[in-house]
Amino acid sequence: MQTKQLRQQLPAGAPDAGTTLTKAVMRAASFLGISQAVVASVLGISTASVSRMASGHYVLDNHRKEWEFGVLFVRLFRSLDAILGHGDQARLWLANDNLALGGKPLELIRTTEGLVRVVHYLDATRGRI
């Protein structure tokens, strides 16, 4: 019911929340140099679904876990962007061991627990800046 009301309030031709989040996830992955296979692991969907996301033929569903993981992934990107900028520094941070996290963030985010831990770590770091 709320989804219908939300869609009725949007101007004609405006993208829905699913399309917006899907594009944000794909753009964040592109900026961070993260492969479709890793994005699939993060979202808990198939690599084929991520490929369809990239081509605009699949949209994240706000009634499924993939939605929550997508929101966390975009949050991760926004935190990295605020702390390091979206460039080589963010990619290096993801790829290198982090003593506080106990591993490489890029590997950790492939699991639910790891994604949440990395996002919380970045939120705490961002809060100090």
Predicted regions: what they are:
Residues 1-129:
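Non-transmembrane "mature" sequence context
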